[in-house]
C-alpha cells in the first residue's frame, strides 16, 4: 500500500511538471527543460507499468505514427541532427497514452488545476502588461528565433501561451461557474484567471484567438443542439456574417477599427477590405491564403501517404498540415488525439450540460486547428487540464454514468406503466 502511494505521488509530480513545461514561456527554450520533461515521462511510465498500464489498438497505432515520424526525420536529415524538431508529435502521443491511463483515476490529478491556473495568471498578467506598453511584441512572439528569447525567459508568452487557453476557454468558463457553488476558492482563482486571460487576449490582438473565444462562448451559452458538426457550421456562419458586416457596413467596420486602433486586428481588417477591393488577397491575409493553398495542393498531390517531408503543407493549419504531411494515417491519428476529450465526455455522459460544454469545446478546437498551427504547448491543457475540468463539473453536479442509466430505466418504467381508464357507469 505504501509503495502504491509512492508510485502515485511520483506520477502526480511528473504530470504537474509536464503540464507546467508545456505552458511556461521560459521553459520553451533551453534543452535542460526538455530533458527534464523526458525524465518526468520516464519516471511516470515506470510507475504506470508497475500499476498495470495497458494499451488499446489506437495507442499502438499512435506509437506506429511516432515510428513513422522518426524514420522520415532520419531519412530527410541524413541522421539524428534534427530528431527533436517534430517534438510536438512525440508529446502528443505520449500525453494521449498518459490520459488514457487516468480514465477512472482523474481524482489523483484534481490538485493540478488551481496550480496551473495560478501559473497562467502570472504569465497572462506579465504578458498583457508588456504588450500594452509595446503592442509590436505580440507579433514578435509568434516568431521562432533567438530574438524572442529575452522575453520568454521573463515569463512573457505569445502564441504558445495564449492559444492553449483559447481551446480550453469554454470548459474553464463553465468550471468557474460551477466552482462558485461548490469550491469557492477555486472559483476565485478561476475569476482571476479569466480577468488575466481577457486582458491578454485583447491586448495581444491575435484575431483567431479572439474570434475562437467569442464563438465558443456563443455556442456554450446559446446552442442547445446535439450535433457538434452543426455547432461548427453555425460558427462558420457567424464568421462569414462577421466578414460580410465588416465589408459592407461602414459604421460597423469603423467602430471595430477605432476599437482595435494600432493593433494586429485592425491590420487584418484593413487587409480584408483591401483584398475585397482589389479582388486578390493582401497583406497578412495573402500570407494565409498562400499557406492554405500550399496545404491543399499537397493533399491533392499525395492524398494517401502525404508529402512526408518537413513542412510539406503550407502551414497555418494544424489539421490540414497533418493530412498534407502524413496523409490519411497522420490526419486520423491527429483527429483521434486532439479531439478525444470532448468526444469522450459527450459520448459517456449524455447529459445536456455536458453535451453543451463538449460542443463548444469541439468548435474552438476545430476552429483553431483548421486556421492555425498547433505546438506541443497545447497538449498539457488539451489532454490533461481539460478532462480534469470535465471530471470536476461532473462530480460537483453528481452526474455519473450510473445515474444516467437509472434515468433511462425510469423513463422505460414510465412508458410501460399500464394506463387504467376510469369505469363508466
Task: Give the positions of each predicted feature.
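Hydrophobic transmembrane helix bundles of membrane-integrated enzymes that assemble
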Residues: 1-255, 294, 300, 317-419
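Mature, Sec-exported extracytoplasmic domains of Gram-positive
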Residues: 256-260, 269
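TM-adjacent membrane-interface loops and short helices in multi-pass inner/ER membrane proteins
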Residues: 264-314, 328-332
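Glycine- and aromatic-enriched alpha-helical transmembrane segments of multi-pass membrane proteins
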Residues: 423-425
Amino acid at each position: 500500500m505504501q509503495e502504491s502511494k509512492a508510485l502515485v505521488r511520483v506520477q502526480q509530480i511528473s504530470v504537474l511538471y509536464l503540464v507546467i513545461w508545456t505552458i511556461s514561456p521560459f521553459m520553451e527554450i533551453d534543452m535542460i527543460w526538455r530533458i527534464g520533461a523526458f525524465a518526468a515521462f520516464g519516471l511516470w511510465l515506470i510507475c504506470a507499468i508497475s500499476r498495470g498500464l495497458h494499451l488499446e489498438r489506437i495507442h499502438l497505432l499512435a506509437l506506429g505514427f511516432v515510428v513513422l515520424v522518426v524514420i522520415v526525420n532520419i531519412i530527410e536529415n541524413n541522421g539524428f541532427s534534427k530528431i527533436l524538431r517534430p517534438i510536438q508529435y512525440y508529446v502528443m502521443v505520449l500525453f494521449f497514452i498518459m490520459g488514457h491511463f487516468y480514465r477512472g483515476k482523474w481524482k489523483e490529478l484534481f490538485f493540478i488545476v488551481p496550480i496551473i491556473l495560478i501559473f497562467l495568471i502570472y504569465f497572462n498578467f506579465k504578458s498583457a502588461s508588456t504588450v500594452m506598453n509595446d503592442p509590436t511584441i505580440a507579433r514578435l512572439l509568434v516568431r521562432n528565433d533567438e530574438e524572442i528569447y529575452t522575453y520568454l525567459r521573463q515569463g512573457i508568452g505569445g502564441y504558445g501561451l495564449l492559444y492553449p487557453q483559447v481551446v480550453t476557454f469554454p470548459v474553464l468558463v463553465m468550471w468557474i461557474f460551477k466552482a462558485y457553488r461548490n469550491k469557492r476558492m477555486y472559483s476565485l482563482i478561476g475569476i482571476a484567471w479569466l480577468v488575466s486571460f481577457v486582458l491578454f487576449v485583447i491586448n495581444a490582438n491575435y484575431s483567431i484567438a479572439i474570434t475562437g473565444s467569442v464563438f465558443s462562448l456563443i455556442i456554450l451559452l446559446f446552442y442547445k443542439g446535439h450535433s457538434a458538426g452543426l455547432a461548427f457550421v453555425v460558427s462558420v456562419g457567424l464568421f462569414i456574417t462577421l466578414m460580410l458586416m465588416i465589408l459592407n457596413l461602414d459604421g460597423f467596420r469603423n467602430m471595430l477599427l477605432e476599437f482595435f486602433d494600432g493593433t494586429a486586428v485592425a491590420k487584418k481588417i484593413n487587409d480584408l477590405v483591401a483584398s475585397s477591393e482589389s479582388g486578390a488577397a493582401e497583406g497578412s491575409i495573402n500570407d494565409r491564403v498562400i499557406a492554405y493553398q500550399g496545404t491543399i495542393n499537397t493533399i491533392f498531390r499525395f492524398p494517401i501517404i502525404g508529402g512526408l517531408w518537413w513542412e510539406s503543407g503550407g502551414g497555418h493549419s494544424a489539421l490540414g498540415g497533418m493530412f498534407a504531411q502524413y496523409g490519411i494515417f497522420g490526419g486520423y491519428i491527429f483527429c483521434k488525439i486532439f479531439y478525444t476529450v470532448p468526444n469522450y465526455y459527450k459520448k459517456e455522459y449524455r447529459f445536456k450540460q455536458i453535451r453543451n460544454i463538449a460542443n463548444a469545446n469541439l468548435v474552438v478546437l476545430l476552429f483553431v486547428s483548421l486556421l492555425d498551427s498547433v505546438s506541443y504547448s497545447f497538449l498539457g491543457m488539451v489532454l490533461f487540464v481539460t478532462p480534469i475540468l470535465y471530471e470536476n463539473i461532473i462530480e460537483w453536479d453528481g452526474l455519473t454514468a450510473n445515474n444516467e442509466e437509472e434515468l433511462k430505466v425510469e423513463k422505460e418504467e414510465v412508458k410501460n406503466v399500464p394506463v387504467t381508464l376510469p369505469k363508466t357507469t
